[in-house]
Amino acid sequence: MNIDLNADVGEGCASDSELLTLVSSANIACGFHAGDAQTMLTCVREALKNGVAIGAHPSFPDRDNFGRTAMVLPPETVYAQTLYQIGALGAIVQAQGGVMRHVKPHGMLYNQAAKDPRLAQAIAKAVHDYDPSLILVGLAGSELIRAGERHRLVTRQEVFADRGYQADGSLVPRTQPGALIHDEEQALAQTLDMVQAGRVKSVTGVWTTVTAQTVCIHGDGEYALAFARRLRAAFNARNIHVIA
């Protein structure tokens, strides 16, 4: 059994270089919520050095709140902003002799696109128009995945090791209790359930089905590196191969 393990990088975390030795895919911030040209270049070089698949991590224009502010923007604006960010990273990747493999929206753009078909359509169209061979990463079972499929993109359904789930398979908003899982054992058990059994237990105690093709681990947590190592060890023990 294979699973992709991804992390968001280029967001100001000192652990990026070490984290890139543990994951198979990197989602690199493109400047709208965090990062700049220099951090993008640094992350691309580190990813290439470690054989990690490179992806763009576009966001709403929201550096003040790390891309976590809800916004209502015209789909054409979201299309243009997404295309702009993908193109910026794509130029750096190409200049370094690499190939960009995927796109994963960030923060509130990701969450809103999971439920808003028009927003999801704008993102999927931007990805397709830039490069139809790119993989679109989105929340498992979401509108973003469906929009990607309509554009005949390869999609990858994502689950989160350290996030709480609602009964409908969506993530618990960060403003609500249970949004983040701080207990390492609970996060590990949840991840293995999602990957091996295709199910997740919601904060209300209801089990719901989920398709896990890639697992996100956040690099900004206090124990992120230790957890990443434990998760890799748990996968190895169960003959689950981490591969992009």
Curated annotation (Swiss-Prot):
Its EC number is 3.5.2.9. GO terms for molecular function: 5-oxoprolinase (ATP-hydrolyzing) activity; ATP binding. InterPro entries: Glyco_hydro/deAcase_b/a-brl, LamB/YcsF/PxpA-like. The keyword Cell division does not apply. Keywords: ATP-binding, Hydrolase, Nucleotide-binding. One of its GO terms (biological process) is carbohydrate metabolic process. Pfam families: LamB_YcsF. Gene3D superfamilies: Glycoside hydrolase/deacetylase (3.20.20.370). It catalyses: 5-oxo-L-proline + ATP + 2 H2O = L-glutamate + ADP + phosphate + H(+). Belongs to the LamB/PxpA family. NCBIfam families: PRK05406.1-1, PRK05406.1-3, PRK05406.1-4, PRK05406.1-5. Forms a complex composed of PxpA, PxpB and PxpC. Catalyzes the cleavage of 5-oxoproline to form L-glutamate coupled to the hydrolysis of ATP to ADP and inorganic phosphate. This is 5-oxoprolinase subunit A. It comes from Salmonella newport (strain SL254).
